[in-house]
Amino acid sequence: MSAPKLLSLGCIFFPLLLFQQARAQFPRQCATVEALRSGMCCPDLSPVSGPGTDRCGSSSGRGRCEAVTADSRPHSPQYPHDGRDDREVWPLRFFNRTCHCNGNFSGHNCGTCRPGWRGAACDQRVLIVRRNLLDLSKEEKNHFVRALDMAKRTTHPLFVIATRRSEEILGPDGNTPQFENISIYNYFVWTHYYSVKKTFLGVGQESFGEVDFSHEGPAFLTWHRYHLLRLEKDMQEMLQEPSFSLPYWNFATGKNVCDICTDDLMGSRSNFDSTLISPNSVFSQWRVVCDSLEDYDTLGTLCNSTEDGPIRRNPAGNVARPMVQRLPEPQDVAQCLEVGLFDTPPFYSNSTNSFRNTVEGYSDPTGKYDPAVRSLHNLAHLFLNGTGGQTHLSPNDPIFVLLHTFTDAVFDEWLRRYNADISTFPLENAPIGHNRQYNMVPFWPPVTNTEMFVTAPDNLGYTYEIQWPSREFSVPEIIAIAVVGALLLVALIFGTASYLIRARRSMDEANQPLLTDQYQCYAEEYEKLQNPNQSVV
């Protein structure tokens, strides 16, 4: 496959423009015929003597243009179509050279800073706080809702998306790159869709659906962490508000109601259609993207910026599945955090004793795999019963953001408790896209799962204001504790009684005469010694 065709998508994916600021150059520079054909995406930062004179900010020592490093270790055998998907060995099907930034510099041209840093020299630490949406003031809640709506309606100043696969990225004439503008929030939706879409095998062939670069594997938590981080940074730039942070929804309430589904927050239920959002909420006006699955799967097209129908949501309304009519319990989170191994073979949705599979929701909260169970993250999605419960569409419902910030908070607490133990995050043989060093699809510049497997306050510039529930004892544990307690009580009573008996005996003995008929007198011994028939030694 020619370099230009491969490069197309890479440009579109400048979601990664790690923390790109509005004043910096847009990776759209790489969505040109020249860039696509060269396989190089190393834009200038501040060219003085013409194009190509300051690639990656090289003149100021910020970075340099280097070959892309991509993980080529083997993946698990469940994906049998090697060579058929643009996302394989990401991003080499699109770009083979990118900016490698020095120190705390980052971005597509090394013009910005790594997470947790800011300033002209990227030498100032920054820490923002993600808080519970329900704990925000009225003004803060309104600000967050307005910011989301603004992101939905604001064209992304930095990124464009590909609307065709790599083979067709330059258009029918081979000279027209197939990219589109898209809003900031819809870009957030698009990147998620692209990571979960089926593998197109050709017209007339059924697309392969047993592939997912962001779910059902070790990368689930790291991928969604970066996904949120990218949106948060984009919204900070949009608002020109560096301290803006994404709040979270603590969905572990055990209730059968959505406590954030009110018109002043994420929208209540419509009185006219129980599956729609109330017209009193701004989110009732939102329209979804990436819903043309039949075209994607049969024609090989990609999701574009076209918006379709409204968001559907009917919390606790799936009467056919009673198990998804109630949200997770607080104790489910407490139990999940006691699962000490990050992941276990086969590193998939049937892993047992895996923290990742537990918080993702394919195991019960104690870590035991059960094919009938949907818990925590999965249960919260299914509870919403609509757009938010369909993987390829779920980010269209803005509750997705809040649901995943809470999931990320659980992840960060696990990292803190277990010292970010990455030893059980596999280097190879995980599902495709989920190896430890794999570049997460479709972010650009490349960012690996490892880079997100760190505690957020120390490494990513944000922290959570949250109180974790302590684990309650189960009925069997309570019974066991009661039995042990009873045995200890019996032992204590027995020991006390024995002590009292011994003490009484000692007291009786103390009250007896010092010399009785039972004891010999020194006089008797003396008389024996005076007997001449006995020898004295």
Swiss-Prot record:
Q: Provide the leader sequence positions.
A: 1-24
Offer a single GO CC term for the protein.
clathrin-coated endocytic vesicle membrane
**Disulfide bridge positions per record:** 30-41, 42-65, 56-99, 101-110, 113-122, 258-261, 290-303
- UniProt-listed InterPro entries: Di-copper_centre_dom_sf, Tyrosinase/Hemocyanin, Tyrosinase_Cu-bd
State the annotated membrane topology for this chain: Single-pass type I membrane protein
What are the UniProt keywords, alphabetically? Albinism, Copper, Disease variant, Disulfide bond, Glycoprotein, Melanin biosynthesis, Membrane, Metal-binding, Monooxygenase, Oxidoreductase, Signal, Transmembrane, Transmembrane helix, Zinc
Q: Which domain of life is it from?
A: Eukaryota
Q: So what does this thing catalyse?
A: 2 5,6-dihydroxyindole-2-carboxylate + O2 = 2 indole-5,6-quinone-2-carboxylate + 2 H2O
Question: GO BP, one example?
Answer: acetoacetic acid metabolic process
The pathway is: Pigment biosynthesis; melanin biosynthesis
Q: Report the enzyme's class at the first EC level.
A: oxidoreductase
Modification after translation (UniProt): Glycosylated.
Say where the protein is mainly found. membrane
Recorded GO MF terms: metal ion binding; oxidoreductase activity; protein homodimerization activity; tyrosinase activity
By what name is this protein known?
5,6-dihydroxyindole-2-carboxylic acid oxidase
Which organism encodes this protein?
Answer: Homo sapiens (Human)
